[in-house]
Amino acid sequence: MTAVKKERWASRVGLVLAMAGNAVGLGNFLRFPAQAVKNGGGAFLIPYIVALILLGLPLIWVEWAMGRYGGQFGHHSTPGIFDSIGKRPYWKYLGVFGLWANLMIASYYLYIESWTLAYAGNSLIGGFSTPEASGKFFEWLIGSQSGHVFAVSPWGLLFFAFCAGLNIFILSRGLAKGIEFIAKIGMPLLILFAAILAVRGLMIVPGAGPQAVDSSWADKQAIAWPTEGLAFLWTPNFDTLWNPKVWIAAAGQIFFTLSIGMGSIHCYASYLRENDDITLTGATAAWTNEFCEVILGGTILIPIAVAYYGLSGLDETIRNNSGLGLGF
């Protein structure tokens, strides 16, 4: 009987990009800017960095070590990994929470993925000529125009089915030919497109309202300069540092953005070799995520939103929402 050859990561670069891709997402580009605005602007970075150093990085290394250890016994999910470490029956039942966490994340991330695909397609055909068009398109996409509580959009379901099928196909390709291959392409493209969007957003010139500029470069839908958004986001309010809720929010953001306690890091790390360096590789993946969050995420959503909605329209919206609705 021939033994099945165990899959491994083909390269360290692929592993880092896959781990970063596991972490980079809504938390970076939508949740982080909203949390920063709500919790002191630029001053939010102080508890944020403290939480990253004291909680984020150590816990990432713990999860990497746990995953690698469990992988030596052939376990690639949290129940098996916990069972190999604890040696008591109840440990594997605690690991079930890791499975449920990933199931819940996948259930709503597929919807977000399908919405993003639909928005990209509509953007290519020039469907967002006005800010109001974006809201109407979202209502059409989720079926809320019907006026029913349990509205269903056929097009929304079609995009969802396509994204679900695409994800299943990638996973069926395995570790190196599926996840790692896509990560090597997708992560560089994500960073490139995010950088382009950030630069393009900062170049918006208002063509309407009291700040309108008479220029061919002016955007007739923009009413403010995007740099006002940067100032709004990063002007520090140090008084907020005395509020315990700000520190809790910073820790929560670190847990959310690094995917700590969700079981996915355990799974990825279980395919490491026994002598692989988890300290350097884990830190590299974490800092890649932080670059996407603080540098890129902090330069996209708020400046662009301020350019089209103004500070007065943004302030109330961002303080009453997490940033998801504003993003779409």
Identify what each model region corresponds to.
Residues 1-30, 59-64, 68-96, 273-277:
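Membrane-interface "cap" regions at the ends of multi-pass membrane proteins
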Residues 2-13, 180, 184-328:
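Membrane-embedded translocation segments of transport machinery
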Residues 3-7, 35-39, 69, 74-97, ...:
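Inter-helical loop and helix-membrane interface segments of multi-pass membrane transporters/permeases
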Residues 7, 36-64, 155-156:
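Extracellular loop-to-transmembrane helix junctions
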Residues 14-51, 229, 263-266, 281-283, ...:
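Transmembrane helix-boundary motif of multi-pass solute transporters/channels
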Residues 15-22, 48-53, 65, 95-106, ...:
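Hydrophobic alpha-helical transmembrane segments of multi-pass small-molecule transporters/permeases
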Residues 48-57, 98-124, 159-172, 188-202, ...:
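Hydrophobic core segments of alpha-helical transmembrane domains in multi-pass membrane transport
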Residues 59-63, 71, 75, 113, ...:
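Alpha-helical transmembrane segments and their lipid-water interface positions
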